[in-house]
């Protein structure tokens, strides 16, 4: 019954299955006469022989197909069985008779027994339908019967599988075996039947077989971690139940580390260096197409690569442009000097984020930014691109990068250089004073006590231009030496550290003044400073303003002025200050009080007293009044800042550091109004502090 149903594989043979009477006769074959030959010398006899051989081959193939169809009918299983409910209905059972003595002997009896069961069930179903209907679901399983009855029943476990599973249907022949599905497909769904049981083969070879004359280096396997105490791989050494053997543990640990080093000898303590990477990829160069790359792209050396035409539309590669970019540290250095030109507001920070490029790193791409070599056609129309652009040429692109991305140190040409600025400009005055005062400050002793107010006033002092008219000098002061500004085209003055200037200044100082006269001039300077301090106390400005000279004028002692300063540094400062208007006190009402000129201060520095140079400049207070400002910066030079009451001139000079008065904006003073309970707390706990362990140890040491 089941053998008549086939899977459908017979349809493969339908194109070759023709009845004998339906075989068409060849109508296109025409033979010539026997005496006629073909142009190639082939006669009809040979053609007939070939045709006969072909017909014999066809007959053999048809006979072979018939044999295969017969075998296919034998090997195939029933298919096309449709089951309404797969949980309640299905094939009765599946029996596979293997090559066994029992199956050969009881083959017929087993088939008859199954047929009798089916007939008896059909008869019961006709007589009583209710008895044959079971409420319980069938138990789909396949049981493997063991032939060995000596095994105890307690140990025997039934190997139950799901319904319709493949137990195995392998047909073994002499030279091959055929593994055919032994279970019919249920509802044409192969998922209801399990797949094949893939056999597991034992590994015969454990080593790689190499070719003749070649040696294969097999990487040693990393040893498995084990207990160094007992050698077991099931637990670690900390969980070992055996007593510890220190000698064995150290020996096994050493063997394990040596084995790990041999297994990972290539990657053990290996470092990567940039030179190795460069050597590895050094043969690849941008813009250069090797023969291997040409073969990979399918182009020759007589044509441009396709990506060149695409680059004309997209532009220069951004990745290689990034390689040509010069890196900037991004650090900004503020030295306190005014480098602005009045274009930025006070307190504004100028961030220089300019990007520069190294033009030598620009890549040459023939056909894109340089001309195409001779003999290579420009096929931009075929690739749907554009012709070479003049703006993409290498020299044009380099000029664009140079003009639009300048170096950080290059300034624009619209700013005036310092040589063309007027000698009396405030900016030049500040630069000259800083350049003259800084060498003297650098050579002072670092352990000297410097007033705090002088440091703050030096770092935050404001330097307006000189006043229009000058007040008279104090009594007993020799007239200053006026040096008019040099006209344009005149060579500069002789440097102050030149031998001629140093010799002349030294001769005047040594012959003109004695030690008593120098001490008298020093007393006059101190008297002028004390009177300036009294003027500051009468003004409305706060006493602790960093721009005033109160803390400076009252703090230094004569010992602080006895500082060794080189003669060249002092004369240099004097020479730089001479082209300007003489520095004087700007308080017109106090005409009789001022400091001595620079020549006297220079002579003080060159004697044994070694006094510091004094620049008689005035300090500008917040209320507009001018007082002398004795600024001993780093314990060195004394500087009096010139004053100007014009606010318009003061606002034009900018500093990268805000004014000191702006640091206290929005800060309210703490008046200690609600601190009545907190006062006197130290007096209350002083007795406890005396009994502290630290004080007790000190008392013990003192008593010992």
Swiss-Prot record:
Region called Disordered, residue ranges: 16-43, 407-516, 529-599
Q: Which UniProt keywords apply?
A: Acetylation, Coiled coil, Isopeptide bond, Metal-binding, mRNA processing, mRNA splicing, Nucleus, Phosphoprotein, Spliceosome, Ubl conjugation, Zinc, Zinc-finger
GO biological process entries: mRNA 3'-end processing; RNA splicing
Q: Which residues form a coiled coil?
A: 43-78, 514-538
Highest taxon in the source lineage: Eukaryota
Q: Indicate, by first and last residue, each region the UniProt record lists as having compositional bias (Low complexity).
A: 454-463
Task: Give one Pfam family, short name only.
Answer: PSP
Region feature MTREX binding, mapped onto this chain: 656-704
Explain the post-translational modification. Phosphorylation at Thr-490 by GSK3 is triggered in cells entering mitosis.
Q: Which InterPro entries match?
A: NEXT_complex_subunit_ZCCHC8 (IPR052115), PSP_pro-rich (IPR006568), Znf_CCHC (IPR001878)
One of the record's GO molecular function terms:
RNA binding
| Ranges of Polar residues composition bias in the record | 547-557
Q: Where is this cross-link: Glycyl lysine isopeptide (Lys-Gly) (interchain with G-Cter in SUMO2)?
A: 411
Q: Localized where? A: Nucleus, Nucleoplasm
> Where in the sequence is Phosphoserine found?
596, 646, 655, 692
* Pro residues bias: start-end ranges: 464-494
Q: Where is this region: RBM7 binding?
A: 284-297, 307-322
The modified positions for N-acetylalanine read 2
Modified positions (Phosphothreonine) in chain numbering: 340, 470, 477, 483, 490, 575, 645
Q: Which GO terms describe its cellular component?
A: catalytic step 2 spliceosome; nucleoplasm
Q: Where is the composition biased (Basic and acidic residues)?
A: 16-33
* Domain topic, free-text comment: The C-terminal part (659-707) contributes to MTREX RNA helicase activity, in part, by enhancing its RNA-dependent ATPase activity.
Question: What is this protein for, i.e. what is its function?
Answer: Scaffolding subunit of the trimeric nuclear exosome targeting (NEXT) complex that is involved in the surveillance and turnover of aberrant transcripts and non-coding RNAs. NEXT functions as an RNA exosome cofactor that directs a subset of non-coding short-lived RNAs for exosomal degradation. May be involved in pre-mRNA splicing. It is required for 3'-end maturation of telomerase RNA component (TERC), TERC 3'-end targeting to the nuclear RNA exosome, and for telomerase function.
Assembly behavior: Component of a nuclear TRAMP-like complex, an ATP-dependent exosome regulatory complex consisting of a helicase (MTREX), an oligadenylate polymerase (TENT4B or TENT4A), and a substrate specific RNA-binding factor (ZCCHC7 or ZCCHC8). Several TRAMP-like complexes exist with specific compositions and are associated with nuclear, or nucleolar RNA exosomes. Identified in the spliceosome C complex. Component of the nuclear exosome targeting (NEXT) complex composed of MTREX, ZCCHC8, and RBM7 that directs a subset of non-coding short-lived RNAs for exosomal degradation.
What's the name of the protein? Zinc finger CCHC domain-containing protein 8
Its lineage reads:
Eukaryota, Metazoa, Chordata, Craniata, Vertebrata
- Gene symbol here is ZCCHC8
């Amino acid at each position: 019954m089941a053998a008549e149903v086939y899977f459908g594989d017979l349809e493969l043979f339908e194109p070759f299955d023709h009845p004998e009477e339906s075989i068409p006769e060849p109508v296109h074959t025409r033979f010539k006469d026997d005496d006629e030959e073909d142009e190639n010398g082939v006669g009809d006899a040979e053609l007939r022989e070939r045709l006969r051989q072909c017909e014999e081959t066809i007959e053999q193939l048809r006979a072979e197909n018939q044999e295969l169809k017969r075998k296919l009918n034998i090997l195939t299983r029933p298919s096309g069985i449709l089951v309404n409910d797969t949980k309640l209905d299905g094939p009765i059972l599946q029996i596979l008779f293997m090559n066994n003595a029992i199956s050969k002997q009881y083959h017929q009896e087993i088939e008859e027994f199954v047929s009798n069961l089916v007939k008896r069930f059909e008869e019961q179903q006709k007589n009583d339908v209710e008895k044959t209907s079971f409420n319980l679901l069938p138990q789909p399983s396949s049981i493997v019967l063991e032939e060995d009855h000596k095994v105890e029943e307690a140990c025997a476990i039934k190997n139950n599988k799901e319904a319709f599973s493949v137990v195995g249907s392998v047909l073994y022949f002499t030279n091959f075996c055929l593994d055919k599905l032994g279970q019919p497909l249920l509802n044409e769904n192969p998922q209801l039947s399990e797949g094949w049981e893939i056999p597991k083969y034992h590994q015969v070879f454990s080593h790689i077989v190499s070719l003749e004359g070649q040696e294969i280096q097999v990487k040693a396997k990393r040893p498995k971690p084990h207990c160094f105490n007992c050698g077991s791989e099931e637990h670690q050494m900390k969980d070992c139940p055996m007593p510890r053997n220190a000698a064995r543990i150290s020996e096994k640990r050493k063997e394990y580390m040596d084995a790990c080093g041999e297994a990972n000898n290539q990657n053990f303590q290996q470092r990567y260096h940039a030179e190795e990477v460069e050597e590895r990829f050094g043969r690849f160069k941008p813009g250069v197409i090797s023969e291997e790359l040409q073969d990979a792209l399918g182009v020759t050396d007589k044509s441009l690569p396709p990506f060149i035409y695409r680059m004309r539309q997209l532009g220069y590669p951004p990745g290689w442009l990034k390689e040509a970019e010069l890196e900037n540290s991004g650090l900004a250095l503020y030295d306190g000097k005014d480098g602005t030109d009045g274009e930025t507001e006070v307190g504004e920070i100028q961030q220089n984020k300019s990007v520069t490029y190294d033009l030598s790193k620009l890549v040459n791409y023939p056909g894109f930014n340089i001309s195409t070599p001779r003999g290579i056609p420009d096929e931009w129309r075929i690739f749907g691109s554009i012709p070479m652009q003049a703006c993409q040429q290498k020299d044009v692109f380099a000029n664009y990068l140079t003009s639009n991305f300048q170096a950080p140190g290059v300034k624009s040409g619209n700013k005036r250089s310092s040589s063309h600025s007027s000698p009396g400009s405030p900016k030049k005055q500040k630069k000259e004073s800083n350049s003259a005062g800084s060498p003297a400050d650098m050579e002072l002793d670092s352990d000297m006590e410097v007033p705090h107010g002088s440091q703050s006033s030096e770092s935050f002092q404001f330097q307006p231009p000189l006043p229009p008219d000058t007040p008279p000098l104090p009594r007993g002061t020799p007239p200053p030496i006026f040096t008019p500004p040099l006209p344009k085209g005149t060579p500069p003055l002789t440097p102050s550290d030149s031998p001629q200037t140093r010799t002349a200044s030294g001769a005047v100082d040594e012959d003109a003044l004695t030690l008593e006269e120098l001490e008298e001039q020093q007393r006059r300077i101190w008297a002028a400073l004390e009177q300036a301090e009294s003027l500051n106390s009468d003004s409305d400005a706060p006493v602790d303003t960093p721009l005033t000279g109160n803390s400076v004028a009252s703090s230094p002692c004569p010992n602080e002025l006895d500082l060794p300063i080189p003669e060249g540094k002092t004369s240099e400062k004097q020479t730089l200050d001479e082209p300007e208007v003489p520095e004087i006190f700007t308080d017109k009402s106090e005409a009789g009080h001022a400091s001595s000129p620079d020549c006297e201060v220079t002579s003080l520095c060159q004697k044994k007293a070694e006094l510091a140079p004094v620049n008689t400049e005035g300090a500008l207070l917040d209320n507009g009044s001018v007082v002398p400002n004795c600024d001993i910066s780093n314990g060195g030079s004394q500087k009096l800042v010139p004053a100007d009451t014009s606010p318009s001139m003061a606002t034009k000079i900018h500093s990268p550091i805000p004014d000191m008065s702006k640091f206290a904006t929005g800060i309210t003073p703490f008046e200690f109004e609600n601190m009545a309970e907190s006062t006197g707390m130290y007096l209350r706990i002083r007795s406890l502090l005396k009994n502290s362990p630290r004080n007790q140890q000190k008392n013990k040491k003192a008593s010992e």
